[in-house]
């Protein structure tokens, strides 16, 4: 999918998604995580579709992995959910509870919300 098409879809659906999730996060596009971060920081992250940064209050979409409207909408929903979650608690689940991604309550919540993606399909 072209970057232009990803921008078009994002511009169409994100205002409604962000309103519904009460998120004021901004969206930026990069081809992949390596394009945004140094290679050392991005090790083992080459499959990321998107991510939310609590430091910048930004959602980063990685265009190399966006091949459908569904991917884009799901990613925007998922990261909007993270934008409303506590960073300290998010990290504590990993660091103090030793949970992995699949068992992390915040990831479970974000993935649950992703299932509502068709609500934003046009």
Which residues fall in each region the model found?
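N-terminal low-structure segments adjacent to metalloprotease catalytic domains
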Residues: 1-4, 60, 85
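Hydrophobic or amphipathic, alpha-helical segments that drive membrane association/targeting
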Residues: 1-5, 30-43
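Zn2+-dependent metallopeptidase catalytic core
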Residues: 2-26
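Hydrophobic beta-strand residues in large extracellular and virion-surface proteins
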Residues: 25-29, 50, 59-61, 76
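Active-site scaffold of zinc-dependent metalloenzymes
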Residues: 36-70
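Post-HEXXH active-site segment of zinc metalloproteases
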Residues: 70-74, 86-114
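Short active-site segment of divalent metal-dependent hydrolases/proteases
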Residues: 77, 81-85
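Short helix/loop segments within enzyme catalytic domains
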Residues: 114-122
């Amino acid at each position: 999918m072209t970057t232009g098409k990803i921008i078009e879809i994002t511009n169409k659906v994100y205002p409604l998604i962000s309103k519904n999730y009460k998120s004021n996060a901004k969206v930026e596009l990069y081809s992949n995580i390596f394009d945004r971060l140094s290679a050392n920081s991005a090790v083992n992250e080459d499959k990321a579709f998107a991510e939310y940064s609590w430091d910048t209050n930004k959602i980063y979409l990685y265009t190399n992995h966006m091949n459908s409207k569904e991917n884009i909408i799901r990613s925007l929903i998922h990261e909007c959910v993270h934008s409303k979650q506590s960073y300290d608690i998010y990290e504590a689940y990993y660091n103090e509870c030793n949970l992995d991604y699949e068992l992390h309550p915040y990831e479970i919540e974000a993935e649950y919300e992703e299932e509502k993606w068709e609500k934003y399909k046009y």
